[in-house]
Amino acid sequence: MDQQSFPSFMASTHFDSSINRNDTRLRIFSGTANPALAQEIACYMGLQLGKIKIKRFADGEIYVQLQESVRGCDVFLVQPTCPPANENLMELLIMIDACRRASAKNITAVIPYFGYARADRKTQGRESIAAKLVANLITEAGANRVLACDLHSGQSMGYFDIPVDHVYGQPVILDYLASKTICSDDLVVVSPDVGGVARARAFAKKLSDAPLAIVDKRRHGHNVAEVMNLIGDVKGKVAVMVDDMIDTAGTISKGAALLHQEGAREVYACSTHAVFSPPAIERLSSGLFQEVIITNTIPVLEKNYFPQLTVLSVANLLGETIWRVHDDCSVSSIFQ
């Protein structure tokens, strides 16, 4: 993808012409979790992916060997820790260790989807805070920086003792919605739970300051959600539900059913991360949604595609961020 296809919400951003986009000290390597996204990122940047050998032994152990020199290089490792989360996390840690032992100057873990991000606090007694543990593991493995996309909660950045660049996938989805022929007066942005209100409010502000509605739910267990009521008016409106991720789709599908009951004309689901644990596909393709809009931070299996699904790419966004990190330029200015 060329720079012309960069989201229009960031098109007004002045790309610093002083950025050295031909620096031979920059290396990008891909793990096995999402090689298609890594290839898109490299294509946007005009680079080739670094040569790396990753294999599994018969007993399940992971082997990583860099097949080119990274001595003194600025290395970026693209590896979301999506399902299977433990496999992909361990692979990332071994990749980081291999780069450190090969004398890379800087190692940035590019984690489009950060697994364990939901385990960011104790909700009951005697629970672990796995997000902090994973942050420690990545740091101890030898990473100098993390580049993550739409973390589940802001406090996760504070769990790392190294710099974290937080990239937002929101502009990519906003740009797509802006291309659709939906009257701004008909729009209402809906948060599927109280915890996502800040995210939905920021989204609504970008959509001509659209009104906001909130689905009030009570969760009785992991991956189980019960919708209680709706705060706000959606009658005759096009409801756009916004969340950072769709896992089993229980929350968002029950919320959509409630929106239809309350008179919504159409319901769109927008999410950066498509975890799609069963029975998500059945729920999302049941006819509740006019369209389900996601990004490719997590690869979607071919069997999980359905007619209402639209997958947008964050490759340009991540590629531009990598250039700016490498050249010590501002990252936040991309989103202003």
UniProtKB/Swiss-Prot annotation:
Listed under catalytic activity are:
D-ribose 5-phosphate + ATP = 5-phospho-alpha-D-ribose 1-diphosphate + AMP + H(+)
Known SMART domains for this protein?
Pribosyltran_N
Gene3D superfamilies (alphabetical):
3.40.50.2020
Q: Mind listing the GO molecular function terms for this protein? A: ATP binding; kinase activity; magnesium ion binding; ribose phosphate diphosphokinase activity
Name the GO terms of the biological process aspect.
Answer: 5-phosphoribose 1-diphosphate biosynthetic process; purine nucleotide biosynthetic process; ribonucleoside monophosphate biosynthetic process
One cellular component GO annotation, for this chain's record? cytoplasm
Which EC numbers does the record give?
A: 2.7.6.1
Query: Domain of life here?
Result: Eukaryota
Keywords of this entry: ATP-binding, Kinase, Magnesium, Metal-binding, Nucleotide biosynthesis, Nucleotide-binding, Transferase
Q: Please give one Pfam family short name.
A: Pribosyltran_N
Q: Which InterPro entries match?
A: PRib_PP_synth_CS, Pribosyltran_N, PRibTrfase_dom, PRTase-like, Rib-P_diPkinase, Rib-P_diPkinase_bac
Top-tier EC class: transferase
Q: Where is the signal peptide?
A: none
User: Which PROSITE patterns does this UniProt record tie to the protein?
Assistant: PRPP_SYNTHASE
Q: Which CDD domains match?
A: PRTases_typeI
- Region Binding of phosphoribosylpyrophosphate: list its residue ranges: 236-251
Residues reported to bind Mg(2+): 150, 152, 161, 165
Q: Which NCBIfam families match?
A: PRK01259.1, PRK02812.1, ribP_PPkin
Family, according to the entry, reads as follows: Belongs to the ribose-phosphate pyrophosphokinase family.
- What is the name listed in the Swiss-Prot or TrEMBL entry for this protein? Ribose-phosphate pyrophosphokinase 1
